[in-house]
Amino acid sequence: MTEGWISLGQLGKPFGIKGWLRFNVRDSILTKVKLPVRLKLGKSDPNFPETEIILLEIRPHNGKFVVRFEGIATPEEAEKWVGGILFLPQNLLPKIETKDEFYVRDLIGLQAIDEFGKSLNWKLTDIQDNPAHPILVFSKSEEEEILIPFLHVFVGELNLEKKTIVLIQPELWNEV
């Protein structure tokens, strides 16, 4: 459904009387994309057809965002899009400007190593959002997952060229 498209976040309840919707993400690359922009909108409901929609405005609001789309002018019209997931074409992603920046999608597949460069035989398979901090999900085998808080105390250097992620002192917290 979304080959070549990046999931941005989920639409929340209508906001105000002019058809705006809440956009449930903490930080959005959409603030760096030239508007208006054509996005895909999908839902997990198989009866909901994937739709293209034009984003006209995005504004910060209470630590999140609100968005306005072409053709949606009332709360009633906005209501049918609640729960929809927005997708942006990959080719519109803003360029990475520093070596410390990355897109979360680029981390999937990294191999875990310890501080000494020894492979832990863990592969990063997912990153879960969490109110306190993201959680890195590593797979050691088909049945075993290891969850690690994405914090400097546990995670060292990310090397996208070598496809590695350094985990700090895994022997101390792996037993928990």
From Swiss-Prot:
An accessory protein needed during the final step in the assembly of 30S ribosomal subunit, possibly for assembly of the head region. Essential for efficient processing of 16S rRNA. May be needed both before and after RbfA during the maturation of 16S rRNA. It has affinity for free ribosomal 30S subunits but not for 70S ribosomes. Binds ribosomal protein uS19. Residues 99-174 form the PRC barrel domain. The keyword Repressor does not apply. The gene is rimM. Keywords: Chaperone, Cytoplasm, Ribosome biogenesis, rRNA processing. Its main location: cytoplasm. One of its GO terms (cellular component) is cytoplasm. Pfam families: PRC_RimM, RimM. This is Ribosome maturation factor RimM. It is found in: Cytoplasm. Belongs to the RimM family. The PRC barrel domain binds ribosomal protein uS19. GO terms for molecular function: ribosome binding.
